[in-house]
């Protein structure tokens, strides 16, 4: 082509159709193929790679070390005791991950093997998707999915445009228009494309779906033509072609370098407060384990210092043992004790927690109260790792538009040339009395006629001044609505289904036959309003825009579009009128338009904008500028240079936009209404009652934001509203913050609300962060207006890292809000009608803001209660399990004799005690869901991770240690030293004694779980009592047969011997009742003396028509403690149908039905109690 391609690392050069230079001096760049690989493993690397990933987890690695120690040295327990549970956990996880990866392989093969047509050697060749190379020209037909990231070359339309939907990428269902450059748009056949000689230079792959910079250099008749390429030219892999027969595009990014593949990379992992607490507890128990092992080792050597205990006759040392190093023996004994006590660390905790989170997350999607019938949207769970975090929220950060409001804009009022109008039935009516007005209104439709594309007010106009003023007023009105009709990115679909987009296709259609769609609802509302007034936008091509003005078609040449961005907060178009005049029309926030204006009714319009904002309306200002031919030539050249730049294109474009968008003439302002969603006020008030602070972060102007905050209850009328706005310097900002802090201190009795704008916020965070945070912490509600997206994310991070480390939620609905959702501890996406990018990138997605109350107060409350109890109970039952093993060493002179049989050691956590806590963690409801939602104050009872505090952790730990003492010493004293408890005069041996302790322990920890359960179903009964029955049946079976593959038969007939002894049964019942009686007494006294709000609500529930869900500890108010204890003992002993819950029971579904309650479980006949 006569030039050397660039070799910068941040750009790539693509020769269309892979026609490389023939001069031999060019070395083609290497690009990857078009295969998509979403799988993690292959047949050859699955085992080593999966094992490596699993053993990176601390718990798995710990048990692997224990297993290896058991293999290397002589330990008191079989390696099977730690090896089998570890093998079970690793195997289950590997099977799950292997199956998921197999599904990914199948999906990859289906995608990579999809048939596509590629232009090669002057014809269409059918091949597979994986064979597409960068530079290939690909043909895509209607409704097909793009197999790679393509730059559009041509379509079946004359203007080279096409429509696509990107719903699978960003969730937006509206059609997007993409256009080809003019030089390739005419190449609509394979033969024509075969003559194309062109090169594309573009940036290297990146994940941003909305960013693409490049240029196409076309050689025609030995002349090079350079055209800029942007996002409008790029067709993304995964998007679908719509309303277009076929297109041709050249592949620029393939395979794992496509934007779709780059966006599939996992998000940064969020860790919940419960997970952090669990890791802390693991470290504490690891310290306890090491301490017990060290103490045991020291005591062993202290004991054996006396000769009579050194070498008992049954355990004589060998010569090698006598001569071995004491240090090595000490280490060996320490490791042996470590193995003996290692089960204090629960290996199955991680697996159980993962299962609980995964299965529990389905309840959110199944909840009909979170289903929005109008949009047919149910709640979505994109991550199950944060379920319990929903019960710990202290701050809610939310956007206004689309989150608190419906995002359905309706044009209400406008200001034109310093006069205010409101729309009534397609007529612009001036507000207030007008001179010489007989009817009191102005019909714009009847008052406009056009001469040379300008309108004038006819004699029928109800508002007349002088002819000169009329002409000026007419021009301003005309330009205002032309600006509204031309300055936008709205697209059109009509009643026609074919041929859409072929030139001026809508010219003959009536406005009622046109349907506008746009990514911005503001633009759609304004264009529709202009159409009702009489200036109808009827279609556009790449180069023209057409409007009908009172039935007369006018075609404007679209010269340039200066796209909207959040920094400028405005957009502009440069058009050429039929008269040849060139105009720039701009619209945007008043803070971005008014400073650029040098003419027009600036002050009057500013007042009108403030008045609109006080009504809660969204405002935009409209302005224009007319260019001379010389001015336009300079602008056109500078825009071309900036748009064709491959380096720093965005910065260069920003400079050019700043140069163009100045010296504007203000035309007026628009005001559209975005009404609040249903029950927003009630939801915000409920959040406030729950102790959750709500911050609204919006880009709207100050007055609009305050008005909406008042109307939605974010600010209430009795609240003292403080303002930190319009600050110009650091010193001024600091002084204002100090004044606000003093006012809060002086008026500490009343609630305060704070309003901050983006400029003042930047100053406050720059030098006065601590002072600003002090003011915010003492405010019940904070409103941040005129905020840029980056500022929103920064505010959330500021609260997250504050000393209190509060849990935050971010609620947003827009694609530019993803960073805020990902910054918050929990991201909540609001599923709008057309904007679902935020929902897809969130942790949870709901259809309406009002659903947030049930998500937090019911689901969050239940999830936290369940998993907090699960974690504490797991450590409790393992303390009960291992502490007797430690205490037993005092009786066997620390000889490392195990108390339990190896099979019991292996199955305790896997089979005997795992299911009751798992079912509890899935189904538990300690109080009726409706009460939780109607009494938001109950949310405070679980805030700040109360159930996993050090105090609660110590209670469960001490409880476990105390029960362990009862198990061991109770068994020892009840069966008696040297006592004969069998009919044949024999005594209990070591294994019988250990089995007795184990039996009491299994029954006690299982019934303890029953005491903690408030919500009983047949599943709870099955797994709770079934676990105890299974233990007895298994023990009878295990001890009743001689198993030839076992190394020893220590347990043969042991359990049968135990259960045949009446004394043993007496000991079992007495110890179980003793342990549980103490638990029951503590529950009664706590509820009588220090009841929480939740427990008081349970008492209320007891006396209401809904029966109490706390089957053990809910008693009528005024009942004496003695009576309460008697009732509780009756319930413990005769625990028939514990809850008697009346929640729309369903006999048809044995598990649950969802009838607008979180769970509805199958009934049991309460009359039997």
From Swiss-Prot:
Q: Where does ATP bind?
A: 399-401, 523, 564, 587, 618, 698-700, 786, 792, 816-817
Annotated keywords: ATP-binding, Endoplasmic reticulum, Endosome, Golgi apparatus, Lipid transport, Magnesium, Membrane, Metal-binding, Nucleotide-binding, Nucleus, Phosphoprotein, Translocase, Transmembrane, Transmembrane helix, Transport
Recorded GO MF terms: ATP binding; ATP hydrolysis activity; magnesium ion binding; phosphatidylserine floppase activity
Q: What is this protein called?
A: Phospholipid-transporting ATPase IF
What is catalyzed by this enzyme? ATP + H2O + phospholipidSide 1 = ADP + phosphate + phospholipidSide 2; a 1,2-diacyl-sn-glycero-3-phospho-L-serine(out) + ATP + H2O = a 1,2-diacyl-sn-glycero-3-phospho-L-serine(in) + ADP + phosphate + H(+); a 1,2-diacyl-sn-glycero-3-phosphoethanolamine(out) + ATP + H2O = a 1,2-diacyl-sn-glycero-3-phosphoethanolamine(in) + ADP + phosphate + H(+)
Note the PROSITE patterns from the entry.
ATPASE_E1_E2
Which gene is the coding source of this polypeptide chain? Answer: ATP11B
Question: Which residue ranges are assigned to the Extracellular compartment in the record's topology?
Answer: 70-74, 304-333, 891-902, 975-989, 1040-1057
* Record EC number: 7.6.2.1
**Region (Required for binding to the RING-finger of HLTF): which ranges?**
794-802
